[in-house]
Each structure stands twice: as C-alpha cells, then as structure tokens.
Amino acid sequence: MTAIIRQFLRLEASGGILLIVAAIIALIMANTPLSALYNEFLSIPIMIKFGALELDKPLILWVNDALMAIFFLVVGLEVKRELKEGSLAQRDRAIFPAIAAVGGMLAPALIYLFFNHGDAIGQQGWAIPAATDIAFALGVMALLGRRVPVELKVFLLALAIIDDLGVIVIIALFYSKSVALVPLLLAALITIMLFILNWRKVSNTAVYLVLGFILWVCILKSGIHATIAGVIVGFLIPLRDKEGASPSEELEHVLHPWVAYLILPLFAFSNAGVSLNGVTLDGMLSTLPVGIALGLFLGKPIGIFLFSWVSVKLGIAKLPDAINLKQIFAVSVLCGIGFTMSIFIAGLAFEGAIEAYNTYSKLGILVGSTMAAVVGYLLLNSVLPKLKQKQK
C-alpha cells in the first residue's frame, strides 16, 4: 500500500472519530438549555464583498455551500488519482468495487422508495440512503487495528470513492434548482479555461484555486449546487506536470488534514444537532425515517453483497486476494454509515420543505448509521483473524 493511501486511511480513521464526537456534542447542545447558543452560532452572519459582488449568508450555509466545496475538491483530487494511478487504474481491480458500489446505491434507494412512493415530497429524498461516509466507516474499522487486512481497507476506500462519484452525479442531475443562464455560461467559460490550463500542464495550483473560487461563485449564482465547482477543479488540476511532479497530490496533501479535522467535523456539528422537541413515536415510525434507516442498514449490505457475490459467481469480477465474502459482507454493513453525506443530501432534497422532513430525515440517518456502525463492527470483529499472541 502506497504512502499516500496509508496517510489517507490514518487521517480518515481519526477524522471519523472526531466526526462522532462533533455529532454527539451537537445533539446534546440542541436538546439542552444550550440550544439557543447552538442556534445563534449557526446563524452568525458572514458577508464577503468584492466590488459589486456581495455574498451574505449565515454560518451554516457557508459551511454547507463553501466549506463542503473544499471537501468535494479533495474528493475530485482523490477520484482522479485513483482512476489514473491508484486502485481503480486497472480494469480487473476496479470492476469489483465498482459493481459493489452500484448495488450499494441502487438497493437503498429502492427500499426508501418502497416506503415513500406515496409522498410526493418524501420521494425527493430517494438518494439519502445511497451515500457512504468514508471517514466514519474507516473510523469504526480503525478500532480493530492491525487485524484488518490491507486489501479490505483498499476495497472500502475504492468502493467509497466510486460511491462519492455517484453522489456527485446525483447532486448535479437531481438536486439543482432552476438554472440562471448568464452565471451558467460564465461557469462554462471558466471551466474551459481550467481545461486549457490542464492541457498545457500549468502546475501553479494558485491559478486553479483563484479560477475555482470564481467558478464557485458563478455556479452558486446559477442555481446548480456550488459544491460541484470543487469537483470540477479537483478533476482539472494536473496529476503530473512536465517534470513528473504531482501538483494534484501536493494540494491534496495540504488540504486533506483541514478537511478531515475541521471541515467535516464542523459540518457534522452544524447539521447533526436535531432537536427532539416535538418528535413523537408515530413520527419516528413514519415512512420517512424508517425508509432512510432501513435503506442504510439493510439496503447497503444487501446491494453491495448481492452485486459482489453475483459478479464473482458469473466470473465478471474477481474477489481481491487475502479477503473472503464474509469480510465483504461485514464491510458492506459498515457502508450503511451514511451520516455526513446522507445529511448533506437530505438538506438538498428537503430544502424549502416543512421542518418535519429535515428533522425526521436526520433522525432516520442517525438511527440507520448507528445501527450500521455497531453491527458492522461486531461482524468485522467476528470474521477477522485474531492477532497471534507473542510467546513469552
């Protein structure tokens, strides 16, 4: 396993533990006398002004629209690296996690729609249980230490990267508002400029980031979700320059600790603080939270394992060396931890809907993700080889 992947796994695992802590603190604050302080913090107004351009948003929207664009920039950098030089570069190595990821997105969406097909607003949340929180999943896996085979970690990483790619496509196609033409045309022009810079192998990442900020503003104003700007920039920063150095990896190395230790925990803190005031048992047993929780807890493992098993039996894909189907199933349960990514999609799906949709969707995500984390850990613990005791 390369040094880059090792560093990625260490950061994601420890960052996942920080995510859990941030979410617990948010839940406590939202349901105690500290709730007023919590809501005031999220509502802090922040304004950025450049000449005639003025962006005035509360803190929570800066987190969701701006900081998460940086997260998706890192995702873009990671996906490009893995597609060109990493675990997805060779077809025979990429096809197994790719097929698993497709099943892991399809089955949860179908389970969710089974429960919510009669609710026109609820149907919009079909993609909520399709996402996997790689940081959280690796954080749980890290609790088992050296017992986890490297190949199993790489499988989870590759699956999650393809899953992220699917989420990006879903956001672009299904969760964008009505489009404003002029900002969209400007965004297209800047994207062409970035493409030309990439083609000429311009290695100065500052140029890409400045144009990326302008692209983010244009996409924000166009009505398409602004996080897509991060993905575009991530894909268009060169993986190798003319001398063979990697501007992409250098930027990823700089940004990744900020994403793992600040941006994602701050996102979790800002969005996981669900007030249980007014929450009823009937509401918790309604189709929205049940569809999300079962989509994550049952849909993810059913889809990932079924598609994996069928692909191996039909000879379409090959099971990676040093791991078995029992371990694949245990990891597929861990992939039901949707958490930050599911919360992010829920915010897009139910933007403008009554607050109950946001509240119960987040509760469904928290319940489903918690069940997936606990059961996934127990299953992994039972199927992984025990460490040999040193003889005295």
Swiss-Prot record:
GO molecular function (one): sodium:proton antiporter activity
Compartments where found: Cell inner membrane
Main localization, broad class: membrane
InterPro entries to which the protein is assigned, alphabetical: Na/H_antiporter_dom_sf, NhaA
GO cellular component: plasma membrane
Membrane topology: Multi-pass membrane protein
Catalyzed reactions per annotation: Na(+)(in) + 2 H(+)(out) = Na(+)(out) + 2 H(+)(in)
Domain of life: Bacteria
Keywords carried by this UniProt record: Antiport, Cell inner membrane, Cell membrane, Ion transport, Membrane, Sodium, Sodium transport, Transmembrane, Transmembrane helix, Transport
TM region(s), chain numbering: 17-37, 59-79, 95-115, 125-145, 154-174, 179-199, 213-233, 254-274, 290-310, 328-348, 363-383
One Pfam family from the record: Na_H_antiport_1
An annotated GO BP: regulation of pH
Function text: Na(+)/H(+) antiporter that extrudes sodium in exchange for external protons.
Family label: Belongs to the NhaA Na(+)/H(+) (TC 2.A.33) antiporter family.
Family annotation (PANTHER family): NA(+)_H(+) ANTIPORTER NHAA, SODIUM ION/PROTON ANTIPORTER NHAA-RELATED
Stated name of the protein: Na(+)/H(+) antiporter NhaA
Source organism per UniProt: Proteus mirabilis (strain HI4320)
Lineage summary: Bacteria, Pseudomonadati, Pseudomonadota, Gammaproteobacteria, Enterobacterales
